[in-house]
Design a protein with these regions (language model features):
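Acidic/histidine-enriched ion/cofactor-binding microenvironments in catalytic or ligand-binding pockets
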Residues: 20-23, 114, 126-155
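Short, compositionally biased
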Residues: 157-169
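Conserved protein kinase catalytic core
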Residues: 36, 153, 164
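Flexible, acidic/His-enriched mid-domain "rim/lid" segments that flank
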Residues: 10-114, 168
Length: 169
């Protein structure tokens, strides 16, 4: 209501226009970020295409104090989320419910989004490294694996932990 959508250029048309305006002879791209069909279309633009994945990786590997602080904060928030979740796990809860707790505390903690789909498995299912949560109800004394991560301040975390309700058998 009260707005109008205006599509001026496609992504590749905008790239082509910019290359011409700036009289560019080279275009640097990250292979991991460009679809094959986009790459094939870029080859038709009449410029040399340089793959910059390694160069960008080398630049990103060096962290300044602000980046290190942001990473530490993201990990601290992740630790706090896990601590809150395990305080609420009870015998009879489903893996789905535990996964929902992870999502809830992540959102409540200010996470921009989850880094990946949360994995919760229990009992013999903990042997499945990428098992998705199910309606299986957790039992006392059995392992519960929780694998999750958040995106906070544009930094990702990834935590995998195994816990028990009571002492392991």
């Amino acid at each position: 209501v009260g707005s109008e959508m205006c599509i001026r250029d496609s992504y590749l048309a905008a790239v082509e226009r910019l290359l011409k305006e700036e009289n560019c002879k080279n275009l640097g791209v990250e292979a991991d970020e460009v679809l094959v069909n986009e790459y094939e279309q870029m080859k038709q633009l009449g410029v040399d295409i340089c793959l910059l994945d390694e160069d960008i990786m080398n630049l990103r590997i060096v962290k300044d104090s602000e980046e290190i602080a942001a990473m530490r904060k993201t990990i601290a928030i992740t630790d706090d989320i896990y601590s809150k979740v395990i305080q609420h796990i009870k015998v009879g809860m489903t893996e789905y419910e535990i996964s929902a707790l992870v999502q809830y505390y992540s959102t409540a903690s200010g996470a921009q989004q989850m880094s990946f789909d949360t994995i919760v498995s229990s009992g013999e299912r903990t042997a499945l490294p990428h098992g998705r949560p199910t309606g299986r109800r957790v039992k006392a004394h059995e392992p519960i694996m929780i694998d999750f991560g958040i995106q906070y301040d544009n930094y990702q975390s990834d935590m995998t932990r195994v816990c028990f309700i009571g002492e392991p058998e």
